[in-house]
């Protein structure tokens, strides 16, 4: 038992400075994390993960801040997430770059008193679940997939005086150097040459403020299926930036820029304890040759609020078409070329393994997309905005419901925002949220009991208008906030008076509810 307890505590000592072998003035050979190499007993309980890869010395270029880009780079600010150390830099034109540490430290999320204890040491040890060179191969794959991407370069930062005040914290380590996807990016093709790249907080605020702002849903779906192919389960809203473009008919259209690929190619379930934890925390899915079709929900849990909102108008056929397109574009040749950018030591150790796994997962993309659609279609929430909308509900066929959402205009015909037909064999509950603005819910027909339909009026002076013909068999409910909503409904429609929670009332509440703020 003492031996088991010793193994479980993961008593990793603080890492010593890495052994650096100078090959030339511009090249070194160094391991990303030799401290993750552990005993066989420890690996049995806590997993082999990518420990061998972390301990492997690789040949890497030394970055010179004065020559890294034309005119050089100037460090301006230290930052980072709860596990990655970042250094923000700018070039002579004010374009921002970032150095992101290859090694991670998740203990920063713990209270200070726990960081150096057994829990902290175990968390630090489990950095070995990350492929230290995974993000480095993503750009070539993303380019082939038609997905926007950053362009990380694997570099070694020596004891460079140009680091200035950040020299002590950032010298003598491996980093990924990449553009920072923010602001004016007209010179970066992989960001769509967008003149304005925005944060998720800004974009979701705009999406619920007005129908003039929209995300290109098929492009977002393409990026999400690409995430699943990479096994990247950590796709919460802060992992995205958004390239904005002016639409032909007016308004703004957003295309996604995924960033931070730390959890792509995750390897977790190869230890006794981590295998058990993986079944409890089903989002911790290992990058294997086959995607776990039985738990596509777990793989996508972090992004579920975004997925439910941004993919709400897409059909199963849309999902199939995008998956088939990705299957065609991510060919074995593309995979082989992408892997070839790895340092030769890395490619020699795991190149064949990754080629096999990526090609195997590619064959599953259509099935994964179909499962993904089914999960999202089961319970649907369709929000409006804080401007006036008209929700039109019709029944095109038995056991079907069609919802069309229009932006209301005072002096011209209403304009279609989006429409989708729901089927009772796919969708159990369908909820429409007016949010702010003076909205109209127009029930031209009532759905059969196969689909439960809920209408939430929200803020503003709203109207809910039912069909003239009597209907008895329906599960349609209007949730009336009691703020003066006009109701003209047949008796078959239930009306429930309720005090709406803030998260059902307007755009700000919706963002809070789904943690998209």
Identify the function of each model-found stretch.
Residues 7-11:
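Bacterial signal peptide processing site
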Residues 31-67:
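Juxta-kinase regulatory segment immediately upstream of eukaryotic protein kinase catalytic domains
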Residues 129-139, 144-151, 209-238, 243:
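A conserved hydrophobic secondary-structure block that centers on an alpha-helix together
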Residues 62-198, 252-253, 257-297, 421-422:
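Conserved ATP-binding subdomain of kinase catalytic cores across diverse folds
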Residues 82-84, 237, 427:
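Extracytoplasmic
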Residues 127-128, 244-420, 424-431, 437-454, ...:
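C-terminal catalytic region of ATP-dependent kinase domains
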Residues 1-6:
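Bacterial N-terminal signal peptides
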Residues 157-232, 245-255, 267-270, 333-341, ...:
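ATP-dependent phospho-/nucleotidyl transfer catalytic cores
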């Amino acid at each position: 038992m003492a031996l088991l307890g010793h193994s479980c505590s993961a008593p990793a000592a603080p890492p010593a400075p890495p052994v650096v072998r100078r090959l030339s003035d511009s090249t070194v050979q160094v391991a990303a994390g030799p401290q993750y190499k552990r005993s066989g007993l420890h690996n049995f309980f806590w997993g082999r993960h990518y420990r061998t890869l972390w301990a492997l010395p690789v040949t890497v270029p030394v970055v010179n801040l004065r020559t890294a880009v034309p005119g050089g780079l100037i460090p301006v600010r230290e930052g980072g997430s709860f596990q990655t150390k970042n250094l923000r830099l700018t070039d002579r034109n004010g374009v921002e770059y970032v150095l992101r540490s290859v090694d991670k430290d998740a203990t920063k999320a713990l209270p200070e008193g726990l960081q150096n204890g057994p829990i902290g040491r175990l968390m630090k040890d489990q950095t070995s679940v990350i492929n230290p060179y995974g993000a480095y191969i993503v750009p070539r794959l993303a380019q082939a997939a038609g997905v926007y991407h950053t362009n990380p370069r694997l570099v070694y930062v020596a004891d460079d005086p140009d680091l200035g005040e950040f020299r002590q914290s950032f010298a003598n380590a491996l980093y990924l150097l990449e553009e920072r996807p923010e602001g004016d990016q007209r010179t970066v093709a992989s960001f769509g040459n967008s003149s304005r790249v925005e944060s998720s907080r800004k974009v979701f605020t705009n999406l619920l403020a007005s129908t003039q702002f929209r995300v290109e849903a098929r492009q977002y779906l393409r990026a999400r299926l690409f995430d699943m192919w990479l096994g990247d389960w950590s796709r919460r809203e802060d992992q995205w930036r958004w390239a904005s473009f002016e639409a032909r008919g007016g308004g703004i259209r957003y295309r996604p820029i995924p960033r931070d690929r730390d959890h792509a190619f995750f390897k977790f379930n190869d230890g006794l304890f981590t295998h058990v934890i993986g079944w409890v925390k089903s989002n911790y899915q290992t990058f294997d040759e086959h995607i776990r079709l039985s738990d596509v929900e777990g793989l996508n849990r972090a992004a579920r609020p975004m997925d439910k909102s941004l993919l709400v108008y897409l059909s199963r056929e849309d999902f199939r078409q995008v998956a088939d397109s990705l299957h065609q574009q991510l060919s074995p040749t593309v995979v082989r070329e992408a892997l070839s950018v790895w340092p030769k030591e890395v490619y020699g150790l795991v190149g064949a393994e990754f080629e096999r796994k990526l090609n195997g997962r590619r064959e599953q993309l259509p099935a994964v997309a179909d499962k993904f659609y089914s999960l999202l279609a089961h319970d649907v929430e369709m929000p409006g905005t804080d401007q006036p909308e008209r929700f039109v509900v019709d029944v095109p066929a038995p056991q079907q419901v069609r919802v069309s959402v229009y932006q209301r205009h005072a002096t011209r015909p209403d304009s279609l925002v989006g429409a989708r037909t729901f089927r009772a064999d796919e969708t159990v509950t369908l909820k429409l949220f007016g949010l702010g603005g003076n909205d109209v819910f127009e029930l031209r027909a009532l759905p059969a009991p196969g689909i439960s339909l809920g209408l939430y009026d929200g803020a503003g002076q709203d109207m809910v208008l039912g069909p003239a013909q009597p209907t008895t068999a329906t599960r349609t409910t209007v949730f009336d906030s009691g703020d003066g909503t006009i109701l003209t409904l047949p008796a078959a429609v239930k009306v429930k008076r309720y005090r709406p929670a803030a998260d059902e009332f307007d755009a700000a509440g919706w963002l809070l509810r789904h943690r998209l703020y």
